[in-house]
Curated annotation (Swiss-Prot):
GO terms for biological process: proton transmembrane transport; sodium ion homeostasis; sodium ion transport. InterPro entries: Cation/H_exchanger_TM, CPA1_transporter, Na+/solute_symporter_sf. It is found in: Cell membrane; Mitochondrion membrane; Endosome membrane; Recycling endosome membrane. One of its GO terms (cellular component) is recycling endosome. This is Sodium/hydrogen exchanger 9B2. Electroneutral Na(+) Li(+)/H(+) antiporter that extrudes Na(+) or Li(+) in exchange for external protons across the membrane. Uses the proton gradient/membrane potential to extrude sodium. Contributes to the regulation of intracellular pH and sodium homeostasis. Also able to mediate Na(+)/Li(+) antiporter activity in kidney. It is a multi-pass membrane protein. Na(+) binds at residues 252, 283, 286-287. Residues 1-94, 142-152, 198-208, 251-278, 333-347, 382-398, 449-469, 518-539 are cytoplasmic. It comes from Xenopus tropicalis. The chain crosses the membrane at residues 95-112, 122-141, 153-169, 180-197, 209-235, 242-250, 279-298, 309-332, 348-365, 370-381, 399-419, 426-448, 470-481, 495-517. The keyword Cell membrane applies. Pfam families: Na_H_Exchanger (PF00999). Allosterically inhibited by the N-terminal domain. Inhibited by phloretin.
Amino acid sequence: MEDSLFSVDKAGPGKDASAASADCNHMVAEDGIITEQHKEIPLVALKVPDGHAPIDECELLNSDDQLPKGSQNQTNICMRIRAFACPPQGCFSLAITNVTMVILIWAVVWSITGPECLPGGNLFGILALLFSAALGGKLISLIKIPSLPPLPPLLGMLLAGFLIRNIPVITDQVQIHHKWSAALRNIALAIILVRAGLGLDPKALRKLKAVCLRLSFGPCVVESCTAAVVSHFIMGFPLTWGFMLGFVLGAVSPAVVVPSMLILQKEGFGVDKGIPTLLMAAGSFDDVLAITGFNTCLGMAFSSGSTLNTIVRGVLEVVVGIAAGLLFGFFLHYFPSKDQENLKGKRSYLILALSVFAVFGSLYFGFPGSGGLCTLVMAFLAGIGWSTDKTVVEDIIAVSWDIFQPLLFGLIGAEISVASLKPETVGLCTATLIIALIIRICISFLMVCFSGFSLKEKIFISLAWMPKATVQAAIGSVALDTARTLENKQFEDYGMDVLTVAFLGILVTAPIGALVIGLTGPKMLEKSESRTVTEEGSV
């Protein structure tokens, strides 16, 4: 029939449609079981109304573009309705699953610990902060600005902790004892130190060009000295505390720099001169120097006695940290042996456990500066011994970091109380931060002079060397935690000022640094002539 939407090709001469159907559905009884014999049926040609050409069924299945516009709209509406069908599908199902998992985590912990997991308890506060910080990081990462690198999720985590602390209704319910928060931050610090130690490439270390060496050490040292002098005169810090603050500020953040550099590298900007690789490689060594300097000053600041005793104490802590790191590193080099099962898992457990033990043990034995050095040296030596196998261990450590990162930045934000901050303190901390940043940018520019870079490239490198985040969050509160352990009120005030500067540094430089890199990179760096750029490994 011409009015029919479908027409069936005849099975053969003299057979009508009913006969073809009978042949197709012919039933045969065999051993009492009825089976159906199928004959090959000619393909069905689909005809559409309004004079449209027939649609091939393969194209109909594989492409929505072949459908008439009205059919596409109906399909989209059906897909949206299906998301709320029973049982739920898609995003609706994902939301229900995630909420259920969060509630179950709390319910399981509550069933074991009781009141500690109710509002006002430590475990309730930790879980609330963890989920809030993770949600804040997710929301920040959803902000997409075309042609710009994404905002670092750590910014949302930091702000989530800050809001929890400074909204009275929430603050009364989310309470975390300072000993619990200090312990969690120290665990996060141990994980960061392990990642930094494993991330050091001995081959790159041997082949470091002069410009990479200068960029790793020059800005960090000069900024630390600048912050020490400025804080000594305008904030009243002792020089040891000033240098401690300086080394907190002196580290650049791989969490901001590396993703931004990878985006530029993928698009071919600065690749011919190796600028993304230079910044990613120098970042690790810059962080190691800052952490080492901080731990040395930490030991000197909390030692009692004369200046000579303080210096000797600082040197002793460095020696003890390096010696313990060498011992643990050689142990991990040979144990577990390569013939054991689950080798990667055992290595990951041992290096994490030893690093946490080193950080907490150094505090217990009165050598607070030794734990960080021990962990760095141990992880570096273990990475050399494991060679290419260390990549799997790094992946496992990264999972631990994914858990503790929201806790770390959330706890740092939760330490800052607007009510307890004095305007003059914020002003002095901001002034110290700005002066140190200006000096760092200038020194970074000088460090890459006479290295074959153009003026625009030098300016870009100096600006890209500005962001602060991960290291500041990890070590910014260590001095405050140590002072609280010793119950020294004067040192607690110094420690809170150090933490405030670290908080402001993250809040200001992390988003601005990411935006500056994304905006200035395409304008100041030369684009590679080759359209295909091979991504080089990140640090």
